[in-house]
Amino acid sequence: PLLSWTASPYVALYFAVRHFWKFDGGRGSFACVWGLPPLDHINARLRSHIVEHDPERYAQRCARTCVEAFYPYQAITRRLTSQSAFFTKTPYGMALEDWLAANGCEDDENLVRIRVPFTRRSVQECLRHLTHMNINPLTLWPAREGACLLANIAIHIDGYHTFW
């Protein structure tokens, strides 16, 4: 399966908190933003682990144990372009975090999880700041869907959009 990523930490933050503006997060409510280092770094670590632990089958295992990335062409959809999206391919039925750990990359250098504590008010404030940075549904979904999502959020969050 393909896992969607973005090259922008602000877009990642938007996707992490975008649904929480309508919920009142109680104690212990968190959203998560995951950080992924350059895939060349991860793949080099995976290869060195294979050389160290299974040198006889290096060529065979290297083909199977590298994280593959897919960068879509701009012509596919404007949505992927505006989200700075790319995808990683992982084995079916396995989370990327588990797959990396199973292949010798279990430390915190490979995937960084940033836990963002939130309340309804803090998420609304965060979304207001992100929209001032031009990160909102209208720019992330450049079509009717984005305009409708923006309007629905703007009705409920005071000062969300400069037009309202």
Label the predicted regions:
Residues 1-164:
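Catalytic-core elements of nucleic-acid end-processing and repair enzymes
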